[in-house]
Amino acid sequence: MTTVDIGRYKRLVQYFWDPEPTNNIASKSPIWCLGEEYLVSDKSSPSAVTESPPKEGGYLLAQSLSTTETTTPPDSTVGSLESSSEYDNCDTASTDGGWPTAFLDDFEAKIWLTYRSNFPAIAKSQDPKALSAMSLSVRLRSQLVDQGGFTSDTGWGCMIRSGQSLLANALLTLRMGREWRRGSSSNEERKILSLFADDPRAPYSIHKFVEHGASACGKHPGEWFGPSAAARCIQALTNSQVESELRVYITGDGSDVYEDTFMSIAKPNSTKFTPTLILVGTRLGLDKITPVYWEALKSSLQMPQSVGIAGGRPSSSHYFIGVQESDFFYLDPHQTRPALPFNDNVEDYTPEDIDSCHTRRLRRLHIKEMDPSMLIAFLIRDENDWKDWRRAVREVQGKGVIHVADRDPALHGLGAERDGAIDEVETFDDDDDDTVLNG
């Protein structure tokens, strides 16, 4: 008897007809977005929301004054239609699908950086190995279309874009506060976006990521990045900024965070504490996230210091910023838009330029469908923040994905790993992660 692949037909139907998801969690579970909690009302109105009481160290909730509408082409979602959902922006509250309006406003306020096209060319590598490191589609495009260099990162830049989004939102929180929503402080937002313009003059442009990836991470232009390479680029590019307002601590090939090393970056020579971005590169299983880590991973997005998760999607990378029960909400970089220009005068950015960096469309993915290779980020603003975060990491339910210790054994000549480290979180190297996190 012939076996019928029902899933194949389901994906085909969803390719042409993908209904809007609704907030149909029977328990009316709260929704979390980078440390902010949104409670769902039991009232009949699908858009009604009950705001949670202030949390210790929490932030005020706000609503935006504007919305944007975006469209993702079918070719960027066909591989995930069965397990992901989309939400199209609508102007009326009655069509919000049961999602709290305050949550949608918060989601929309996050900076969303995607594939871009028609930017100044990124020169190809002359290394004979560079061509074989590209995917077949990128290789063909480079030979037939981008013969003079890469003018688009479509097909290979998704991890870079996820990393850019993560860094941009860390800067957004640092400069404008967690409570910021669209419709205010537009010039300050433009200043942040200009840092990520698709131009080699912008300090956090894709050109700069590719340049450092080639020189320090062994990544050729047009080659997929993994979380490890993205973290190293974020750290290097941030450190290259004179009088940077932000510092970056990366865990390297492990999930252990050491206080002495962290403080040497955030507060060198016992000087004033500088806000520091912690980037934890980890792999929480082989092909799927091991269930024992589920609760701890959910908790990472509930902490006030959370800046999200980059990676974590089979065959691609996304930027995860929210969670409800076991569903994770994310911003998808797999949509090609015109290049974001570099402007010396930030007032020259048009409303269309700004709108292209935001979306009100929700996408969600069950944790069992997520790829285990990822970059988890936290913004530590001061020493009290550090103490709160360290306590929260220690108190998570389930098996922890992050471990904090007082001293780095390598710095003190101890030469010993933390007990049980080998048996816990599986880490990755660049050869590993890039096989699963492609653009």
UniProtKB/Swiss-Prot annotation:
One of its GO terms (biological process) is protein processing. Keywords: Autophagy, Cytoplasm, Hydrolase, Nucleus, Protease, Protein transport, Thiol protease, Transport. Its EC number is 3.4.22.-. Coiled coil: none annotated. GO terms for cellular component: cytoplasm; nucleus; phagophore assembly site. GO terms for molecular function: cysteine-type endopeptidase activity; protein-phosphatidylethanolamide deconjugating activity. It catalyses: [protein]-C-terminal L-amino acid-glycyl-phosphatidylethanolamide + H2O = [protein]-C-terminal L-amino acid-glycine + a 1,2-diacyl-sn-glycero-3-phosphoethanolamine. This is Probable cysteine protease atg4. The gene is atg4.
